Amino acid sequence: MKRILFGLLLLTSLVSKAQINVTFYGEPDELKELKTRLLLVEILEENEDVLEKLSKPKKAEELKDYKKFIVDFNADFKVYAQKYWTFTDKMEFKTATEIKDLQKAKNKSYAVLRLIQLNDKGYWGVRTNQNVPALAFTRIESSVAKADSKIYLPSRNLNNDKSLSEADYKYALSILQANVDWIIANNKVLNFDKYAEKMAKENVSKLKGKTLLVEDNMLMKGRSKEQAIKNYGGDLKFVSENELSDALVSKAKNTAVVYTAPYGIVKSNAPFVSVSTIVYFKIIVDCETNEILWLYMPGAMNWGANMSNQITEGEFKVMADLKII
């Protein structure tokens, strides 16, 4: 099952500041209590405003895609939430409207797992309509904008694939729960960015000796696979999306996979110019343990860093040197 439409943009080249809210609003004791609640998995509904915007004949294909997205996402989310959510097996599936009704009744006995959009907050430059998709695990009484915990969703648009695979759900749900468990165990809140960096630094030595799988289309056009393999200096294989996904789902031993996901919006700071774009990080995950082994998440001040959803030969040298960016 692979389906999800997000419509993210490819990177052009810019320098600027992060534009989305990455804060976790749940404190350790609140997250500990949250794990014990009955889980509501939010089912999407068609949005009347979106339907109206797409009602014109020239938008017919977009309307069709939007309606299909709702149906397909809900079907997949039901399956994979039940398969990969381990905090509880007590869950119900409710629409956003039903969850809002429970909120209005001030019912605080539920946790919610939902798809959210991290919108451009306009911290810098002109606010845009760009956003970063994420999954949130949060208290029902919390607002959508102030989720207790969240994780960015992987990007699969390199293949013009309007979808997430089972492996993508496994990656997101497993690491989101691991992030929450770390916060509880250490009595300290780390958002995903900081948590992933910490785990990568602690685990990067485990990357040595593993077979590393990279999706064929992730290598930037015009770049050399031979040079990438030479730079890595280990067992590096370029494979299809299905092969990579199968390895993660089947918990392939001594194998790791490279993922990419959007994590922010950057804007130009040039006078009289307003340009913004989505930026991406790369992450390596152990197929058997779901541990984060490596992270490449450049900040705005990392001049010349590759923030696209593709990878160059240079990043493989960074992997080989066990460096975290």
Question: Which role does the model predict for each range below?
Answer:
Residues 1-27:
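Bacterial Sec-dependent N-terminal signal peptides
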Residues 19-59, 63, 218-325:
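Hydrophilic extracytoplasmic domains
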Residues 19-132:
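Start-of-domain marker
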Residues 38-41, 90-94, 108-116, 124-127, ...:
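Ordered hydrophobic segments in well-structured contexts
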Residues 66, 70, 74-75, 178-183, ...:
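Charged, low-complexity, helix-prone segments enriched in Lys/Glu/Asp/Gln
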Residues 98-172, 299, 313-325:
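Extreme N-terminal leader/targeting regions
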Residues 129-248:
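Acidic, serine/threonine- and glycine-rich low-complexity intrinsically disordered segments
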